[in-house]
Regions:
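An edge-strand/N-cap motif at the start of beta-rich repeat modules
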Residues: 1-32
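Structural preference for solvent-exposed beta-strand-turn elements
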Residues: 8-9, 14, 105-215, 309
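Short glycine/acidic-enriched loop and turn motifs that connect beta-strands
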Residues: 14-18, 66-71, 121-126, 211-213, ...
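Short loop/turn segments immediately following beta-strands, especially the blade-tip
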Residues: 27-34, 81-88, 141, 151-162, ...
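Beta-propeller fold detector
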Residues: 36-43, 90-97, 161-178, 224-229, ...
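Blade-loop segments of beta-propeller domains
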Residues: 37-112
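Beta-rich, blade/repeat-based domains predominating
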Residues: 46-56, 99-110, 130, 136-143, ...
Length: 396
C-alpha cells in the first residue's frame, strides 16, 4: 500500500433491477494514481447499511438492515467478518439477531468489549387488527414496529457472544405531521437512528427521530437512562458528532433540515440546545432531509449531506463552536429521500472525503482544502447501490 492510499469497506443494498445481491466490498484507494483496486467481497449481508471497523482485532461489524415479514423469514442481524480474506472473500466469524427491525447504526466500545445497535423499525402500519365483538362494538387497532437499542457482549477477540440488554423505546410524535414521509405518519412511534458513544465512553447517546428526542444512557452491559432532551415537534433528530473536546454536539435534524448545536456535560450527561441552522442554501425551498454528519480532525469544519437539495455541504465552525454554511458540491438527484446518497467518511489525515453516491452508483473521492474546508472531486469509481463507507486502514 502506498503512502497516499487507504483501504475502505463499502456496504451495499440489494437491487432488483440490476440483480445486485448487496453485500460488502473492500477497496484500496490510491489518491496519487486516482485508482480503486477491489480486494475482497461478500454477498452477505444483502442490506449492509452500516459498518464498524474494530482495529484492535482487525474485524468488521455489519448490520443486515431488514425487517422480517413473518416468523419464517430472514430477520435483521449483526455480523462480524474477519479481514483475513480467503480467496478474496470476507469470512463470517459470527452473527446474532437484532431485537428490532432495520438496524441503522453501530457503536463499538472496545474497552468494555461491547457493541451497541440502534434499530429504527419500519415506517408506517405494520399490521391492522380488528378487535371487539358484536356486543361491545368492532374496533380497528394499528400495530407498529418497535424501535430498540441493543447491547451485545463481545469476546476479547471481538466475536459476538450474546445480547446483554434491549431497550425498547416508547412514545410517538405528532401524527399526522407536516413531514411528507409516509404521508405524515413517520412519527407513529419511536425510531432510534443512531447510538453514539461519548468521548471517554461514559455515555451512549441515542437520537430518536420518532419522538424528537436525544436520549442519554450510562454505558455498560445494561444501559441506564439518565437524561433526555426533547426537541421542537417534527424536527427528527438523526445523527450526531462530538467536537474534539467532547463539550459540543452537532446533530442533524432530518424533518426540519437543520444542524443543531448542543452543549454536553461529559461528567453528568446534561444537554443544552444553543443553536439551529438550515443545512441547505437560502435559495433552496423544496423538501430536504439531511442524513450523515462528520467533523474534520481540525475541528474547524462540518460536513452534512442533503437529500432533496442533493448536495454535500460544508460548514465553518467559529471560535464559539457555532457552524456557518460555506458551500456545497452537487450530487446525483435522489429518487426520494429514502433512496438517496447518505454516507461518507473523512480520512484520518483529514486530506480526503469519500462519498457513497447511491443514486449514481458511484463512490466519489474528494480532496479537502484544509484552509476553507471546500471539496474538490478528484475521481470516481462504480459500485452498485452503495449505502455505507468505512475506513479499514490508512495513513494518519
Amino acid at each position: 500500500m502506498s503512502t497516499e492510499s487507504i483501504v475502505i469497506a463499502i456496504g451495499t443494498y440489494s437491487q432488483e433491477e440490476s440483480l445486485h445481491q448487496g453485500g460488502i466490498f473492500s477497496y484500496e484507494i490510491d489518491f496519487d494514481l486516482k485508482s480503486a483496486n477491489l480486494l475482497a467481497e461478500t454477498k452477505i449481508p444483502s442490506e449492509a447499511g452500516y459498518l464498524v471497523f474494530n482495529s484492535k482485532n482487525r474485524i468488521l461489524y455489519a448490520v443486515d438492515e431488514r425487517r422480517a415479514i413473518g416468523p419464517n423469514t430472514n430477520s435483521s442481524e449483526v455480523s462480524v467478518y474477519s479481514l483475513k480474506y480467503e480467496n478474496n472473500k470476507f469470512v463470517n466469524q459470527s452473527s446474532i439477531k437484532t431485537f428490532g427491525a432495520n438496524p441503522t447504526f453501530l457503536a463499538l466500545d472496545v474497552d468494555r468489549n461491547l457493541l451497541f445497535s440502534a434499530n429504527h423499525g419500519g415506517l408506517g402500519v405494520h399490521a391492522q387488527k380488528i378487535t371487539g365483538n358484536f356486543e361491545s362494538g368492532w374496533k380497528t387497532e394499528f400495530i407498529f414496529d418497535d424501535s430498540s437499542v441493543v447491547t451485545y457482549k463481545l469476546s476479547p477477540e471481538g466475536d459476538l457472544i450474546e445480547v446483554s440488554d434491549v431497550k425498547v423505546l416508547t412514545g410517538n410524535g405528532i401524527v399526522p405531521n407536516k413531514s411528507p414521509q409516509v404521508a405524515g405518519f413517520a412519527q407513529t412511534g419511536p425510531h432510534a437512528h443512531c447510538a453514539v458513544l461519548s468521548p471517554g465512553g461514559k455515555f451512549v447517546l441515542v437520537a430518536d427521530k420518532g419522538t424528537d428526542q436525544l436520549i442519554v444512557y450510562e454505558a455498560g452491559e445494561i444501559l441506564k437512562e439518565i437524561n433526555s432532551l426533547k426537541f421542537p415537534d417534527v424536527t427528527g433528530p438523526r445523527h450526531l458528532v462530538f467536537s474534539e473536546t467532547g463539550e459540543l454536539i452537532y446533530l442533524t435534524l432530518e424533518f426540519s433540515s437543520e444542524v443543531a448545536t448542543l452543549i454536553f456535560d461529559n461528567k453528568t450527561g446534561n444537554l443544552q440546545l444553543i443553536n439551529r441552522i438550515s443545512t441547505v442554501s437560502p435559495t433552496f425551498k423544496e423538501l430536504n432531509e439531511p442524513a450523515e454528519i462528520r467533523i474534520h480532525r481540525t475541528n474547524k469544519f462540518l460536513y452534512v449531506n442533503n437529500r432533496g437539495e442533493d448536495s454535500i455541504a460544508w460548514f465553518h465552525i467559529d471560535e464559539d463552536g457555532l457552524p456557518t454554511r460555506k458551500g456545497d458540491f452537487k450530487l446525483a438527484k435522489s429518487i426520494h429521500p429514502g433512496l438517496a446518497a447518505r454516507s461518507f467518511v473523512i480520512t484520518p489525515d483529514g486530506k480526503h472525503l469519500i462519498f457513497a453516491d447511491r443514486p449514481a452508483n458511484l463512490i466519489r473521492v474528494f480532496s479537502i482544502d484544509i484552509n476553507d474546508g471546500s471539496l474538490l472531486e478528484i475521481f470516481v469509481f462504480n459500485v452498485l447501490n452503495p449505502a455505507y463507507v468505512e475506513i479499514l486502514e490508512g495513513k494518519e
